[in-house]
Every structure is written in C-alpha cells, then in structure tokens.
Amino acid sequence: MKRTMLYLSLLAVSCSVSAAKYPVLTESSPEKAGFNVERLNQMDRWISQQVDAGYPGVNLLIIKDNQIVYRKAWGAAKKYDGSVLMEQPVKATTGTLYDLASNTKMYATNFALQKLMSEGKLHPDDRIAKYIPGFADSPNDTIKGKNTLRISDLLHHSGGFPADPQYPNKAVAGALYSQDKGQTLEMIKRTPLEYQPGSKHIYSDVDYMLLGFIVESVIGQPLDRYVEESIYRPLGLTHTVFNPLLKGFKPQQIAATELNGNTRDGVIHFPNIRTSTLWGQVHDEKAFYSMGGVSGHAGLFSNTGDIAVLMQTMLNGGGYGDVQLFSAETVKMFTTSSKEDATFGLGWRVNGNATMTPTFGTLASPQTYGHTGWTGTVTVIDPVNHMAIVMLSNKPHSPVADPQKNPNMFESGQLPIATYGWVVDQVYAALKQK
C-alpha cells in the first residue's frame, strides 16, 4: 500500500510539473571540491600497480556537488588478440566505451521504467500477464505464482525465477534452449519458478529480461530505440548505445572483453559460440545469442562521461538541464530499501547493510545506491554526500585462471581492484581527509 500511495503521489507531480531547470555537470578540481589530492594520488598509483599486475583497463570518474572533479583512464582497451599479448595494445582513454553488463539493468531498463511510471503508463503493482500474453502458471508447475506475479516482484528480484537458465546453451538449458529473441520470450514463460514469489530475494537476469519485454510491450518499439531516442538523446548523450558496432562506432573506441569468445579459454561449447576476442559485442551470452544484443539485463555500452550525466540525473531527482525524465518521488520509490532485504530497492542495490561492502565500501552513507556489472563496472550514487562514482573496466579481458576448476574466474578477477569497494573507500577517505 505504501508503494501504491507513493506511486499516486509521483504521478500527480509528473502531471502537474512542467520541465524544470536542473543542475548540469561542470568541470572542477578535486582541491576545490574538498578532496585530499595526495590521497587521490595514492589511489592513482595503486590502480596503476594493479594494471601493471595484469588488470586490463580502468576508467574512473567522480562527481561531487554537481561537478566532475576527477576523471582518468588506465591500462588498455585491448591488449590481447586471442590468448596472445599484442605488441601494441589499444590504450584506454577517458572516452572509451565499456560493456556495462548488469549496469544495463539500471541505466536502460530502470530508467525506462522510471520514466514510464512517472507518465502513468505502468504501475509497480501491475501483473506481468497484463503486458505479456500467455504468461501464466501451467497445470504441471510444481511452484505456482506466475498468475499473480507483479512488476515490483521482478524489480525486487523476488519473482521466483532461477538466477541463470543459460538459454543459449543447449546442453544446460535443455527444453528451454533459445537463440532467437521471439523464442526466448516463450522460453521465459515456460521457465519453472524455483521458489514462491515474494518469499526471498534471488538475483536473476530473467527478471530483467522480462522487464525489458514489458517496456517494449508498453512503448511498442525495441528497448534500444526507446532509451536511445527518448532518454539518452534528450540528455545530449551520444556514447550510450546497444550494439555499438551497428551504430557507427569502431572497435578501437570500445574496450574488449573475453579473449576466446565465450569459451572460457576453450572449456565451454554450445551452438554458434564465439571463439575470437570479443570487441564491440556484448559479452553476456543470453543478451548476445538469445536476445540479439538488446536485452533488459545486459547489452548497453557507455563511457564514464555519459554515465556521469545519468547518475547526476538521479542525484537531481529525475532531471538534467531542461529535461525532466521522472519525478523525485519516482527516484525515492525506486531507491527505498525493501522491507524484506535492506540491500534491494526496485532494481537498484542499496547500501543497506555490511553485505554490500564489496560494492559500496565502508564509508558511503546508508542511503547510497547503485549497481555492479560482471564485466567490471560499478556505479555508486550517494544522495547524502551529493556524490557519485563510476568505475568502468574490462575485467574479463585476461586469461581464465584455471578453466577446469572455475571457468568464470579470470586472472584479473583475483586482483584486489576487482573488489570495487576498495576504490570507493579511497574516494571517500580522500574527501574525509581534506
């Protein structure tokens, strides 16, 4: 009921308020923003050491009080060709595009949902079946609940779906196998629930794949076209896209990821699997093979400058410059902790307890929210300190440490920088040690 009343409030605001003038980002220096420069220099040297130790490439940007106060790139956008180190790596620059992985959930799908809910086109308590015909329990389902599943259940990752059905891998997915977007929706409808909806939180890509389909059902166009034309373009963003190679970008502008396609250095095989270095295509298997590169859970590419504008839009309460995407009430609704688990908002992860230290560190305010991405991306938005941090990297662009033991552990993932919270803590420590 509380969520519903808040929704009605935000809808009333969105209907009565015309486009407002919101703060826009300007450039400043760490000193003027109150940061201890030597502490930031120590962080800089440490990141350089991590790159020297094998971490591929990193971009870091810091916002404080509506100003970009720090922006830097380290390492390589591409340094491997297959498993062979390149003699002349492609350097990472502050403009390099990175595969955002699960940060797509926030900066594409959540932004779309926040906008549509502000416009009254969606409600968090709407049932999924309202937008996805045929989404229902079947007589043979052991666990039922699809008939009453709501949008908010998916946003809370409490919808009952498994974490990763691996639809494109026939040997794993079995009868749910799909490498076609239309067929994938049918497979999602058939995917058995693993627990009673609302009884727990299990982070699942399926939740956001389904939310992406819901957005497309409401707007009547592909998700990528909607967010690029209705969200990013009005904000002046030109480097935030799905399928960048199909939209005018060159590989040299983009950070590469896995060395040998999706094979984890040769131990994984399924129909049509990519085997050469991934450069400009989404790494995520479900997004690439099952969804054509455009999905609600993964597929978005961006750089730190564009992400900075999107984070500032959240700090501003839903707008940027003369553009209002959604209301402050919408932001509050989406970033308020769930009663069942303080670390989950509506999609956004919240700094609700110590389990979020690997993401938010130990110094961010409890109201801080953001998200991570499997490729090595993290965004941190702190409304109390009016600060935001984005770190983009291409963590999978390194050999797998032991493909037989753990095909998902890359050598770079064993380095301390792969725990984002350490970098986040250094930023906060620099602010507190003026």
Sequence positions of predicted segments:
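Short, gly/Ser/Thr-rich active-site loops of penicillin-recognizing serine hydrolases
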Residues: N316, E329-T330, K339-E340, N353-T357, ...
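Short, surface-exposed loop or secondary-structure junction motifs
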Residues: P23, K78, P139-P366
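Short, glycine/proline-biased beta-turn/loop segments that scaffold the active-site neighborhood
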Residues: H123-D141, R233-L235
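Sec-dependent N-terminal signal peptides
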Residues: T4-V13
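Short, surface-exposed beta-strand/loop micro-motifs that present aromatic residues
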Residues: T368, T375-A388
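Short, conserved catalytic-motif segment at the N-terminal edge
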Residues: S28-Y98, K121, V400-M409
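Active-site SXXK
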Residues: N41, I47-S48, N66, Y98-I128, ...
